Regions:
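RNA pseudouridine synthases
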Residues: 1-117
């Protein structure tokens, strides 16, 4: 879990935030009071924005999600223009999600595909 709900920011500029999502933390939740990456990052933006806009919540768009049990990097857009461009890149192979699994034990095959429905 996130210690004291401080996000681990990997990269941030005026348009995007790339952060590490720990296992167990949802990317986004519709339940009031649930700590998720969206609310954690919005709090980060409120605390660290140079021009304090107290009357307006910061813009933050989820570009892709990771399941709650999964940890990894998430990309968020800080502007509508960045959200549009990143969404376009995601659908046209500009960038994507890659998974790495760690497994224990002795396996019959060195390679394979795991499908979980």
């Amino acid at each position: 879990m996130i210690s004291s709900l401080t996000p681990e920011i990997i990269y941030e500029d005026k348009d995007i935030i790339v952060c590490h999502k720990p296992a167990g933390v949802p990317t986004q939740s519709n339940r009031i009071g649930t700590k998720d990456m969206v609310s954690i990052l919005k709090n980060h933006l409120i605390k660290n924005t140079a021009k304090k806009t107290a009357s307006r919540e910061p813009y933050l768009a989820v570009i892709h999600r990771l399941d709650q049990p999964v940890e990894g990097l998430l990309v968020f857009a800080k502007t509508p223009a960045a959200a549009k461009e990143l969404s376009r890149q995601l659908t046209t192979s500009g960038f994507g999600k890659y998974y790495r699994a760690q497994a224990l034990g002795i396996f019959e095959h060195n390679e394979g595909t795991l499908e979980d429905y």
